[in-house]
């Protein structure tokens, strides 16, 4: 009886454990029917840690490829204590017998049950050491939890790899749930980012290309643009990050382009082919031309040099203001000048006549080249060839209207004051010290020097610096019938007593086209004189953009009348 009581006690303990396992696992696995003594307390205590170990179970469930083999072993192990299992039915306990009978039938039936056994995760560390333990709630109480053997290290590494794969699959699953909308958003985001990146690259490309050739729309006549010799090379150099190398290459590019432009200067400065002021000044002001670039065969080639000389006076604030003023371009277009003379806009103060000074230098040397002597015939033919296109453009009606009606009314006091002014060491006739292209031949400079010596010897009164006076002293030969009585200085008559007669004879014989040009230049001079006041050379300009824009328009109305 004692044995019979003891046996049911053991059977009761086993049945209670099995019933707990059946309640935990809805599948009703027969594996846990007779657990071994070692993992049984772990399984009993593991009920508390079920929620904490679910993720590890998933990893082990996917990672264990050896479960089918374990399932074949486990059904054999309950056979050892299987002798205890038949003992409870003779004990005449209905509930334990009812609980044990289905397990025996399930174990004997086989069939679908072994497949369910493989689904139960087991502890891999315990398996390495020959023990099968259920993983649920087993992690904290595993005997080989901190084992460092080779097999356990391999298990740990495999678990890490499987966890990474699970995380990757979960991320991909969430992306698939979002569908194509997420991908479309990514594409839009990439497109916006690429647009933001490409905009500065286009700007850098335009900067690296340097001075781009002006298109045909910038010209009034629509001439061909300058050839772009370096744009392809600059595009290939966009990957370079050396700023110093970029500056050197751009400087070389400017010089090459300047040489090409000077060869086409005559075509660019025709009346219908004016270059806008800001573009020309921004390009020309960067690099000063070297000597010998301009050929002196054509008479009209002094015009780019004239602009270069005015650009060299950028040290004063007046020149910078005028060259950077946008109204310069409009005054270029509003002046109805001939094709061989380009006049800077008329400014009020005398200090602004620095702009006129270089033009006067070119104009007076060209007129002195026409004096009777060695170069008269040659220069006359050059001027005739150069001005042949002007005769068709100018109607003869403009002859009387080119000179303004207030020209004879210039006060004699101002004329005498400007006639008797001292010729400074550096006047409009003195060659500038900077390097620039030769304007006329050497015989013209020799004649000019002769006039300079006469003027400097006979003139002794110190006065204001000579600025617009050379223009008046030269062009009074054509206006002697109008303003001649007002000129009382004897040295002017001595210097140019032969020039007016022969010059007028030449103009009468040939045509009146050159007189038109000189009268127009004289008109601009007198307008500048009357507007001007007695100011020092270093005073700032007293004009605005509106005043500059208004004055040429009034001059145009005078000429049209």
From Swiss-Prot:
UniProt DNA-binding region: 123-170
UniProt feature, compositional bias: Low complexity: 68-85, 92-106
Acidic residues bias (residue ranges): 13-26, 45-67
A single cellular component GO annotation: nucleus
Gene3D superfamilies: DM DNA-binding domain
Molecular function GO labels: DNA-binding transcription activator activity, RNA polymerase II-specific; identical protein binding; metal ion binding; RNA polymerase II transcription regulatory region sequence-specific DNA binding; sequence-specific DNA binding
Compartments where located: Nucleus
Entry keyword Nucleus: yes
Keyword ATP-binding in annotation: no
BP GO annotations: embryonic skeletal system development; myotome development; positive regulation of myotome development; positive regulation of transcription by RNA polymerase II; regulation of somitogenesis
Tissue: Expressed in testis.
Induction comment from the UniProt entry of this chain: Transcriptionally up-regulated by PAX3 within the dermomyotome.
Region (Disordered): 1-119
Pfam families: DM
Consequence of gene loss (knockout): Mice heterozygous for Dmrt2 mutation exhibit no visible phenotype. Homozygotes are perinatally lethal due to signs of respiratory distress. They have rib, sternal, vertebral and skull base malformations. Expression of myogenic growth factors, such as Pax3 and Myog, the growth factor Pdgfa, cadherin Cdh2, and the filament protein Des is abnormal. Mutants lack most or all of the epithelial organization seen in wild-type somites, sclerotome and dermomyotome. Mutants have disrupted production of matrix components including laminin-1 in the dermomyotome.
SMART domains: DM
Keywords: DNA-binding, Metal-binding, Nucleus, Transcription, Transcription regulation, Zinc
Primary location class: nucleus
Family under the similarity heading: Belongs to the DMRT family.
Subunit record text: Homodimer.
Cited function: Transcriptional activator that directly regulates early activation of the myogenic determination gene MYF5 by binding in a sequence-specific manner to the early epaxial enhancer element of it. Involved in somitogenesis during embryogenesis and somite development and differentiation into sclerotome and dermomyotome. Required for the initiation and/or maintenance of proper organization of the sclerotome, dermomyotome and myotome. Is not required for sex determination and/or differentiation in embryonic development.
Name of the protein this chain belongs to: Doublesex- and mab-3-related transcription factor 2
Name of the gene this protein is made from: Dmrt2
